[in-house]
């Protein structure tokens, strides 16, 4: 790192603070962990108070317009802060900066931003900082050739859960999705690098590992090593000390019987599967370029439940895709009832630049909102019934943090990803404990320590 070893800036960062705001998915969260490590390695310390920070960074998401608009608003709110203290450094990174449309908005309308870099340029941050400090002029790096498939240090959100990237990018080109443009085409990391990273995490006391990829099921497809995702998952599950193993996200078209077998045969692989549906209509699924139909999706869900009793299935659902009719929407509701999802991430369709769907005429906002409301009215009772099944049962819970509303209550997750509230001492955070479930809502279950 040129900046760290530069005599001029040797002690520059000792009393400096940084603040990171992250939008979007787990991969963005993990990228922020990597950025955090780099900044602290330079000498920065973290602060949750943006006004108190010397270095302010926004790690962006472009999947939906809402996150994009939030970013513009929050950056604009810093103009006065930057005017009052020009030495503050403001940076914007992530998926938005990989696309020319969003990047140009920042470049032209937000002069307060000093450093711009993309998803493939995180390791270059020290050099970008050095260049900015030397010239005082805006620095931009969104080049495509900076990715190294090596072990990368990062600051995890805690000392018992960690994300591990197994691949980058996506080759599916769903008609509504900008990820192939913002994250690039699929690249799989070498299995040996992934195994080494997990082994190091376990040595340092981490209990739960989550493997990350835009579509983990296509891991290894274009690589010179002959390892599939089920094979990689099994290798990871065999690492001594891995108490819980998760992964996300899986494309339904690539879900194999072999993957189901691996989950079934390895007790430390969590009984939770995120299977994005998006729509229950064959016509809309075809328009979305999802490459599966309603019956194929239902069969995948049925097989998961049949082979792995008690498995929890979550999904993603988009309402209001431009070609969706009321009949199509009813097909989506039908799948929700037949599968009985444990939870769902629901979204109103958001047109993204340079995607095929963005060229289509949108559905009236009132119709979309009405369908969205009816979707939630259908899902919430299903969630409630699924959670009610836990009452009276003893479950293992990895305690993660204090409740925001009551410091005497800790929150954690079951292996089925149920959010659990339990009265317990904060010294138990990071431990897996047994909890007897006594109550539930549509979104949580609660109980007592056993």
Label each residue range with its predicted role.
Residues 224-234, 257-271, 324-341, 366-369, ...:
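Short, electropositive alpha-helical surface patch
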Residues 1-219, 228, 269, 273, ...:
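Proteins enriched for Cys/Gly/acidic motifs involved in redox and nucleic-acid/cofactor modification
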């Amino acid at each position: 790192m040129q900046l760290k070893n530069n005599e001029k800036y040797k002690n520059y960062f000792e009393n400096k603070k940084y603040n990171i705001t992250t939008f979007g998915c787990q991969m963005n969260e993990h990228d922020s962990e990597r950025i955090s490590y780099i900044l602290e390695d330079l000498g920065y310390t973290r602060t949750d108070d943006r006004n108190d920070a010397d270095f302010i960074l926004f790690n962006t998401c472009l999947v939906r317009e809402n996150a994009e608009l939030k970013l513009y608003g929050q950056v604009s709110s810093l103009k006065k802060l930057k005017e009052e203290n020009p030495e503050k450094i403001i940076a914007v990174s992530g998926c938005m900066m990989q696309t020319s449309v969003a990047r140009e908005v920042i470049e032209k309308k937000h002069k307060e931003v000093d450093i711009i870099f993309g998803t493939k340029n995180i390791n270059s941050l020290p050099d970008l900082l050095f260049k900015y400090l030397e010239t005082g002029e805006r620095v931009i790096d969104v080049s495509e050739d900076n990715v190294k498939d090596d072990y990368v240090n990062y600051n995890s959100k805690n000392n018992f859960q960690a994300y591990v990237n197994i691949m980058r990018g996506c080759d599916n080109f769903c008609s509504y999705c900008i990820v192939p443009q913002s994250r690039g085409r699929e690249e799989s990391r070498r299995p040996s690098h992934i195994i080494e990273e997990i082994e190091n995490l376990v040595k340092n006391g981490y209990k739960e590992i989550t493997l990350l990829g835009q579509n983990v099921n296509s891991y290894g497809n274009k690589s010179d090593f002959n390892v599939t995702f089920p094979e990689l998952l099994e290798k990871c599950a065999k690492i001594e000390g891995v108490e819980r193993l998760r992964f996300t996200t899986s494309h339904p078209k690539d879900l194999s019987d072999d993957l189901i077998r691996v989950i079934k045969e390895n007790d430390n692989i969590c009984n939770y599967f995120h299977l994005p549906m998006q729509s229950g209509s064959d016509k809309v699924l075809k328009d979305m370029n999802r490459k599966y139909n309603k019956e194929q999706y239902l069969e995948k869900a049925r097989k998961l439940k049949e082979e792995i009793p008690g498995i929890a299935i979550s999904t993603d659902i988009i309402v209001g895709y431009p070609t969706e009719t009321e009949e199509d929407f009813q097909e989506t509701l039908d799948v929700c009832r037949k599968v009985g999802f444990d939870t769902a991430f629901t979204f109103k369709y958001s047109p993204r630049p340079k995607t095929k769907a963005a060229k289509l005429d949108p559905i009236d906002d009132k119709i979309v909102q009405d369908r969205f409301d009816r979707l939630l009215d259908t899902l919430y009772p299903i969630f409630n019934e699924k959670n009610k099944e836990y009452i009276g049962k003893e479950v293992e819970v990895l305690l993660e943090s204090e409740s925001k509303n009551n410091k005497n209550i800790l929150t954690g997750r079951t292996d089925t990803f149920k959010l659990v509230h339990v009265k317990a001492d904060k010294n138990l955070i990071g431990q897996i404990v047994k909890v007897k479930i006594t109550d539930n809502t549509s979104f949580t279950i609660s109980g007592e320590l056993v």
